[in-house]
Swiss-Prot record:
This is 3-hexulose-6-phosphate synthase. It comes from Staphylococcus haemolyticus (strain JCSC1435). Keywords: Carbohydrate metabolism, Lyase, One-carbon metabolism. The keyword Transferase does not apply. PANTHER family: 3-KETO-L-GULONATE-6-PHOSPHATE DECARBOXYLASE SGBH-RELATED. One of its GO terms (biological process) is L-ascorbic acid catabolic process. Coiled coil: none annotated. The keyword Lyase applies. One of its GO terms (molecular function) is orotidine-5'-phosphate decarboxylase activity. Catalyzes the condensation of ribulose 5-phosphate with formaldehyde to form 3-hexulose 6-phosphate.
Amino acid sequence: MELQLAIDLLNKEEAAELAKKVEEYVDIVEIGTPIVINEGLPAVQHLDENISNAKVLADLKIMDAADYEVSQAIKFGADVVTILGVAEDASIKAAVEEAHKHDKQLLVDMIAVQDLEKRAKELDEMGADYIAVHTGYDLQAEGQSPLDSLRTVKSVIKNSKVAVAGGIKPDTIKDIVAEQPDLVIVGGGIANADDPVEAAKQCRDAIEGK
């Protein structure tokens, strides 16, 4: 099981500083969509230049022009790139092909997908490396949790890894870990903690069953 830190609300310098502090506890560090919107792909490059062990994920949430956008993210140092599960099949296939051509990975974000079971099966067959169930900020505010979605997707896929995101914190991560996802994505639960290093350590300990 892997742990990913999602960084959304910092600038690229702050993001790299945070990543360096917690890198020993995380497998992947994500430059979130808001940072990409604010600062562009150089934010991905800046992170890549400042960490040495964790993989770098560029959360582009691609919807179209997939092969080009994946190739650009990789050029700027991304190891994993995201595309939306609601994108056209042609876009998903092009993104998978482009990522794999460079020995990189594609994560498909299931935010706003209505028929999770059907789409997860299709994405699995298309070669997605990760399928991520994602309760976004707007639904978290309504009290939704990604647990049911995680169970649904996990039950139908054969090859892809299952990732889970959405409001996960050190004090709730054990409920998620109990469902055995392949990748747990924590954002504000680490980034906004009074002690981000301790929060990251707690998440890592939970994943390792300590």
